[in-house]
Amino acid sequence: MCSGNQTSQNQTASTDFTLTGLFAESKHAALLYTVTFLLFLMALTGNALLILLIHSEPRLHTPMYFFISQLALMDLMYLCVTVPKMLVGQVTGDDTISPSGCGIQMFFYLTLAGAEVFLLAAMAYDRYAAVCRPLHYPLLMNQRVCQLLVSACWVLGMVDGLLLTPITMSFPFCQSRKILSFFCETPALLKLSCSDVSLYKTLMYLCCILMLLAPIMVISSSYTLILHLIHRMNSAAGHRKALATCSSHMIIVLLLFGASFYTYMLPSSYHTAEQDMMVSAFYTIFTPVLNPLIYSLRNKDVTRALRSMMQSRMNQEK
């Protein structure tokens, strides 16, 4: 009986993957772990607070802030899908993940990545409607339209996850099962396959082009029209207001699309596994930290709502 159980456990262990993690073979693993843990807490707190502010402050019940709250929710889920497993594994010494766990992690990651790309396109269209079509804005971006746009973003993201995850996990992995990443990322996992994945890589490349092309076209068109309108404005105050409205969103767009292009569209010969891991860490850990800061520190409405919430809490304690 014991021998049978041990054999079963060994077979299970042999099918598990090993995640490299950010701290592998580092002389400063403790320092890196502490910094990562603090960034994780900052991102959780910042995004949760942003969602709470938007939902509790009536002045923030607008389409723009509705989309920002969805972006914050996606960032929270990004963090919870990838980072806790790495942090716990570093403490317990268990860096393994089962094939089913790997597939689940990959599905949620791809779903969130796809949904966020389309959400940024929806946010760009919202900024276009606000700046270029102010009189029609209440009709163009009413509550039903906003809910439909967000639902479409989630559905399209799920389609991405449902298409790529089963195919990736169906390949035989007969080389080393050590994934050179801190989570189950498609490019890192494909490097472990002993079968020919060149056709699938081409299909994945085309899928990424289609997934990024439509949002890029919407974002580019929206900001081209916005910049054209700004150029025609005679008011300096109008210039500043229009640019302030769009600048925060453009920063997030450049961060996310730059990282996505590097990871999924640049040929693997142009970057190493270590560089891939750093880029992955940037947009799964650092970007969720930056998003609340970009949207709060640069936004008077959010800072005003935060001060109002803090004052009301202090008055309640008195």
From Swiss-Prot:
Pfam families hit by this protein: 7tm_4
Bilayer topology term: Multi-pass membrane protein
Disulfide bond positions: C102-C194
GO cellular component labels: plasma membrane
Gene designation per UniProt: OR2T3
Transmembrane segments: 31-54, 63-84, 106-125, 145-163, 201-224, 242-264, 278-297
GO molecular function: G protein-coupled receptor activity; olfactory receptor activity
Membrane topology, Cytoplasmic segments: 55-62, 126-144, 225-241, 298-318
UniProt xrefs under InterPro entries: GPCR_Rhodpsn (IPR000276), GPCR_Rhodpsn_7TM (IPR017452), Olfact_rcpt (IPR000725)
SUPFAM superfamilies: Family A G protein-coupled receptor-like
Ranges facing Extracellular side: 1-30, 85-105, 164-200, 265-277
Glycosylated position list: N5, N10
The protein's name: Olfactory receptor 2T3
Provenance organism: Homo sapiens
Phylogenetic placement of the source organism: Eukaryota, Metazoa, Chordata, Craniata, Vertebrata
GO BP, sorted A to Z: detection of chemical stimulus involved in sensory perception of smell
Subcellular location: Cell membrane
Key words of the record: Cell membrane, Disulfide bond, G-protein coupled receptor, Glycoprotein, Membrane, Olfaction, Receptor, Sensory transduction, Transducer, Transmembrane, Transmembrane helix
Tagged with keyword Cell membrane: yes
Annotated function: Odorant receptor.
